[in-house]
């Protein structure tokens, strides 16, 4: 039982506690000893509660008990203080009143109290029914009151505690908690307490071992041979780091805050001494340290819990089958036959994963295998990496027909992959706060590998049929796996990661004896892995010169197919939000056009133009149009219209506008987009300088995102503009409501264009917390194209509502006409490209400077 001196009249318990907490916070800022902080905070609250209990004259027959984390003797700066008011029997009205007054005074002291009032029998009953209550009482600690009553509670509690049942319940609870956080420690804003790899995963281990009598500290688990010395040291170090992060989060937020929110990541990183450099933000350096700790905790949690399970549930079931002299399968898990295998034969480390791939029915690695891998780090040195046998095994792992993704993920989880590929280790846990990627670099790479592999699996052929078809005809799929593994391996080093990664890939191919034909393709893919995406999304695919240049870069069908497959896998592996049907269409169009050119098709603009027109005429005849009805409209169209639209689009807008060539009123027509998502909208109207801005403003007010815009002015001064628009969650364009929205857009947009109103100020749309915390520095690049006829305007900035309208409004104000617009939204980042009429810009340098300045202002958050 603890005792404490009564407070003097001049100092209330609240004042004493407040002063002590402030002193401890200042001490922590100076020395950063988190274990001292949480222990002393708990002691300070102990003293305050004991003083209050005595001042209130609480009955000697009752006991005040600390439970939960507070019972463990730890309190974080703004954690709840969980207490149990233990009674010998159910309280009468008078005692209830006194207990309520006591709890009220606890709140008055500034404590966030979580209280329960129970008898011993009620405690046991609740603990039997609710594992959360059972866990809270597991760490109970007497503060003051009737010690005999508390000992009775302890005896009854221990007598009813079933370690095996407790283990099963906590395992289920942990799996449910992990599922809530998507089973990954690598979220953008992880919860340092609850996420996989967080403090809770460490507490689960100690709860289970305490309940089973195996120990309640890492040292006790070491003594009881549940941990090795290295594991105990690692667990203590990672626990200390996670506790420090949690304590600093509480202090920075001024309240209980366990989530590493974007708003606090930079400040938290600075508190740890990180500073930004050319390659990494402060927040990225902090999060890498967190992810490494969470990864280690996840790995050790799995190892230790499997060992606890083996102790609690000893099984008589023997080896299911012997695989070879080094490995056996037991209940679907791959075990090493000898705990010293890796120390004796380091080559068996990589063999583990090859056997895992090749052995049907094996679903994971057993606890003894995981532990042996964890403790074999010193074996995985430069000599081990240079061993020809290990190099052959690693290449064989990448060349297997199945199991590659799972094997590589296991290799990453056990840190074997980073120990074999040293440069891969450098990007493990590296987050990119670019508003684009939502995975760490290592997780992104493994996601891309997974996407490439799925193209080769028959069961997944329905997901991306065209990719699956190409992969089925690709002679060596493993080449793409190697390229995927290296495509972003040089991220965060500074410099061009494609060039640096290419050098890494070339070195790997040479060291692993990969044939020159395959090595050349791998190296080329790593160097050019962004090329196809950039051409498809930022250049004019209707320009034969663009296609000819890209075809020259690619050179062959094999290279084209490989690049296309890697590009699709890469974009889909950045974020669930980035891939859409429009990007799929652009990439597939570029693939098919380039394939025709590689097969000998002409890129002569005149031949392409005539071929496109003839295709459109055929479609118009099929639509029962008079063979000459289109001629009046087409006579007013320049070559660009026919080169930038495919035959189906030309036939579509021709059918709607052919008999309205000289209309005085705007005409708007819309249809379900041929790509399968969103709408395609065509506008035909007497031209005006602010037309593009008006249309942009309308779509943004409706919550529709413009993905692509093709802007043309006819020979007689009319605008013929087509737009590809999507619904990014506004709910406006939903299956079953297309007819209504098409009618609405056609009517409202035509009416808006016809009005002679001043362009409204662009809205300052709300931006996300992530965008506020990690804004993209706006960039404006304005330069003439090779022919000097147009100017290319490239922009990148943080996305927000109203941004495109703000850009269009600046262009309209300076009477600069837009010819094409490629709107590329990557998560919360935009990278837009506009082709502008160059006549006014060529004649006026001041206009160029004014345009760039005002655009930068419009892009600013």
UniProtKB/Swiss-Prot annotation:
Where's the ACT domain?
680-763, 792-861
Q: Which reaction does it catalyse?
A: [protein-PII]-L-tyrosine + UTP = [protein-PII]-uridylyl-L-tyrosine + diphosphate; [protein-PII]-uridylyl-L-tyrosine + H2O = [protein-PII]-L-tyrosine + UMP + H(+)
- Record's keyword terms, sorted: Hydrolase, Magnesium, Multifunctional enzyme, Nucleotidyltransferase, Repeat, Transferase
Keyword Translocase on entry? no
Question: Gene3D superfamilies, alphabetically?
Answer: 3.30.70.260, Hypothetical protein af1432 (1.10.3210.10)
One GO-annotated biological process of the protein: regulation of nitrogen utilization
Ranges where the record places region Uridylyltransferase: 1-322
Indicate the segments forming the HD domain, all copies: 441-557
Q: Name one Pfam family in it.
A: NTP_transf_2
Task: Output the PANTHER family linked to this UniProt entry.
Answer: BIFUNCTIONAL URIDYLYLTRANSFERASE/URIDYLYL-REMOVING ENZYME, BIFUNCTIONAL URIDYLYLTRANSFERASE_URIDYLYL-REMOVING ENZYME
Its biological function?
Modifies, by uridylylation and deuridylylation, the PII regulatory proteins (GlnB and homologs), in response to the nitrogen status of the cell that GlnD senses through the glutamine level. Under low glutamine levels, catalyzes the conversion of the PII proteins and UTP to PII-UMP and PPi, while under higher glutamine levels, GlnD hydrolyzes PII-UMP to PII and UMP (deuridylylation). Thus, controls uridylylation state and activity of the PII proteins, and plays an important role in the regulation of nitrogen assimilation and metabolism.
Q: What is known of its domains?
A: Has four distinct domains: an N-terminal nucleotidyltransferase (NT) domain responsible for UTase activity, a central HD domain that encodes UR activity, and two C-terminal ACT domains that seem to have a role in glutamine sensing.
Instruction: Please give the family membership noted in the entry.
Output: Belongs to the GlnD family.
Q: What is this protein called?
A: Bifunctional uridylyltransferase/uridylyl-removing enzyme
What gene name is given for the protein in this entry?
Answer: glnD
């Amino acid at each position: 039982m603890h005792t404490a001196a009564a407070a003097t009249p001049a100092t209330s318990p609240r004042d004493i506690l407040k002063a002590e907490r402030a002193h401890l916070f200042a001490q922590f800022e100076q020395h950063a000893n988190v274990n001292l902080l949480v222990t002393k905070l708990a002691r300070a609250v102990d003293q305050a509660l004991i003083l209050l209990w005595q001042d209130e004259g609480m009955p000697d027959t009752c006991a005040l008990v600390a439970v939960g984390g507070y019972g463990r003797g730890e309190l974080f700066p703004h954690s709840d203080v969980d207490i149990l008011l233990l009674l010998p029997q159910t309280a009468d009205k008078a005692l209830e009143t006194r207990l309520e007054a006591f709890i009220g005074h606890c709140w008055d002291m500034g404590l966030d109290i979580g209280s329960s009032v129970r008898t011993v029998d009620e405690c046991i009953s609740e603990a039997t029914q609710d594992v959360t209550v059972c866990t809270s009482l597991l760490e109970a600690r007497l503060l003051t009151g009737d010690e005999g009553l508390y000992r009775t509670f302890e005896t009854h509690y221990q007598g009813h505690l079933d370690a095996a049942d407790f283990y099963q319940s906590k395992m289920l609870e942990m799996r449910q908690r992990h599922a809530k956080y998507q089973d990954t420690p690598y979220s953008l804003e992880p919860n340092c307490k609850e996420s996989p790899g967080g403090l809770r995963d460490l507490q689960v281990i100690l709860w289970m071992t305490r309940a089973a009598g195996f120990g309640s500290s890492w040292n006790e688990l070491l003594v009881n041979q549940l941990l090795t010395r290295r594991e105990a040291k690692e667990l203590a170090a990672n626990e200390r780091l996670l506790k420090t992060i949690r304590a600093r989060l509480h202090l920075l937020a001024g309240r209980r805050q366990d989530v590493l929110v974007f708003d606090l990541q930079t400040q938290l990183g600075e508190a740890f001494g990180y500073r930004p450099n050319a390659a990494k933000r402060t927040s990225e350096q902090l999060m890498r340290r967190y992810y490494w700790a969470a990864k280690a905790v996840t790995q050790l949690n799995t190892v230790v819990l499997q060992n606890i399970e083996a102790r609690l549930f000893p099984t008589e079931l023997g080896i299911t089958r012997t695989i070879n002299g080094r490995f056996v399968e037991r209940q679907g898990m791959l075990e090493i036959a000898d705990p010293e295998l890796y120390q004796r034969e380091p080559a068996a480390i990589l063999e583990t994963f090859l056997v895992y791939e090749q052995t049907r029915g094996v679903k994971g690695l057993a606890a003894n295998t995981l532990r042996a891998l964890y403790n074999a780090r010193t074996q995985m040195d430069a000599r081990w990496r240079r061993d020809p046998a290990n190099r052959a095994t690693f290449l064989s792992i990448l060349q297997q027909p199945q199991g590659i993704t799972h094997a590589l993920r296991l290799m990453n989880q056990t840190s074997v992959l980073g120990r074999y590929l040293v440069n891969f280790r450098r990007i493990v846990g590296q987050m990119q706060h670019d508003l684009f990627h939502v995975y760490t670099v290592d997780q992104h790479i493994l996601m891309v590998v997974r996407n490439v592999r799925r193209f080769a699996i028959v069961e997944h052929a329905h997901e991306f049929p065209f990719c699956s078809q190409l992969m089925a005809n690709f002679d060596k799929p493993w080449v793409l796996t190697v390229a995927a593994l290296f495509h972003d391996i040089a991220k965060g080093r500074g410099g061009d990661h494609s060039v640096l990664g290419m050098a890494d890939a070339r070195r790997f191919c040479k060291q692993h004896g990969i044939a020159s034909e395959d090595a050349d393709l791998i190296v080329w893919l790593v160097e050019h892995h962004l090329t196809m995406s950039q051409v498809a999304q930022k250049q004019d695919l209707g320009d034969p010169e663009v296609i000819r240049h890209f075809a020259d870069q690619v050179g062959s069908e094999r290279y084209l197919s490989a690049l296309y497959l890697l590009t699709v896998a890469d974009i889909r592996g950045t974020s669930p939000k980035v891939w859409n049907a429009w990007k799929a269409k652009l990439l597939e169009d570029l693939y098919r056009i380039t394939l025709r050119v590689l097969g000998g098709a002409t890129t002569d603009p005149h031949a392409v133009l005539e071929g496109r027109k003839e295709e459109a005429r055929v479609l118009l005849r099929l639509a029962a149009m008079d063979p000459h009805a289109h001629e009046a409209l087409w006579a007013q169209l320049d070559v660009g219209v026919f080169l930038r639209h495919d035959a189906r689009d030309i036939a579509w807008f021709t059918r709607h506008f052919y008999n309205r060539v000289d209309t005085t009123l705007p005409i708007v027509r819309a249809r379900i987009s041929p790509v399968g998502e969103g709408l395609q909208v065509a506008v035909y109207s007497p031209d005006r300088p602010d037309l593009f801005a008006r249309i942009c403003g309308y779509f943004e007010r409706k919550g529709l995102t413009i993905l692509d815009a093709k802007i043309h002015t006819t020979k007689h001064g009319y605008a013929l503009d087509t737009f590809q628009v999507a619904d990014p969650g506004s709910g406006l364009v939903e299956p079953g409501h297309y007819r209504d929205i098409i009618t609405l857009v056609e009517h409202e947009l035509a009416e808006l264009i016809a009005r002679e109103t001043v362009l409204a100020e662009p809205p300052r749309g709300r931006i996300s917390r992530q965008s506020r915390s990690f804004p993209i520095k706006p960039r404006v690049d304005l330069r003439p194209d090779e022919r000097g006829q147009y100017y290319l305007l490239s922009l990148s900035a943080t996305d927000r509502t109203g941004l495109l309208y703000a850009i269009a409004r600046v262009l309209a104000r300076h009477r600069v006409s837009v010819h094409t617009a490629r709107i590329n939204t990557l998560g919360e980042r935009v990278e837009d490209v506009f082709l502008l009429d160059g006549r006014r810009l060529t004649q006026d340098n001041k206009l160029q400077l004014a345009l760039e300045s005002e655009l930068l202002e419009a892009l600013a958050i």
